[in-house]
Amino acid sequence: MKAIKIAIDGPASSGKSTVAKIIAKNLGYTYLDTGAMYRSATYIALTHGYTGKEVALILEELEKNPISFKKAKDGSQLVFLGDEDVTLAIRQNDVTNNVSWVSALPEIREELVHQQRRIAQAGGIIMDGRDIGTVVLPDAELKIFLVASVEERAERRYKENLEKGIESDFETLKEEIAARDYKDSHRKVSPLKSAEDALIFDTTGVSIDGVVQFIQEKAEKIVDMS
């Protein structure tokens, strides 16, 4: 049976990662968290106090401490920078609020996209992000673009933060998500937009199971036809 490439794009907190992880597990595919890669680069920038003018130093740190993914005993995915487990650190609010400017740096995107394409070559992979279907995997057999209202996405982020013990204010989250949407869709390099051949799916009011079922059925149909 042919293993395909699945690209899931969408704005912040549209459910991309949650859905992608479940589908990868169900299909026996590899899940590549591209957002975690950009968050890791952002974590490096913030930890060392680097600005957008010091891209070479961020890349140097990435080379010294490469991004890798490992599985925890419970099956969840851990993110490492070199030997440092940054799984929780890269989800903190300061990283979330700065990832847009770091991910907009052309040199950072070029390096991480190169890594992502190399990993995806063999197929049997599902990636989520903001430019997977348009830039990273334009040849993906299935492209999905998830959308949801700012209100619903802020509520999801608020619940996620509660579960992780991160303090947050709902109204502030709404403002931050709206600002992130604007930054991501207006950046010069790889702006957030759906691929022309992507299936657009509004997840507002739709359960995770409902979104998973929709995408998985599309994937299985493509596999059956190939």
Curated annotation (Swiss-Prot):
Catalytic activity: CMP + ATP = CDP + ADP; dCMP + ATP = dCDP + ADP
Amino-acid positions noted as binding ATP in the UniProt annotation, renumbered to this chain: 10-18
Location in or out of the cell: Cytoplasm
InterPro entries: Cytidylate_kin, Cytidylate_kinase_dom, P-loop_NTPase
Primary subcellular site in the record, as a coarse category: cytoplasm
Entry-linked Pfam families: Cytidylate_kin
UniProt EC number: 2.7.4.25
Keywords of this entry: ATP-binding, Cytoplasm, Kinase, Nucleotide-binding, Transferase
Cellular component, GO annotation: cytosol
One MF annotation (Gene Ontology) recorded for this entry: ATP binding
Top-tier EC class: transferase
UniProt similarity note: Belongs to the cytidylate kinase family. Type 1 subfamily.
NCBIfam families: cmk
HAMAP family, A to Z: Cytidyl_kinase_type1
Protein name (record): Cytidylate kinase
Organism annotation: Streptococcus pyogenes serotype M4 (strain MGAS10750)
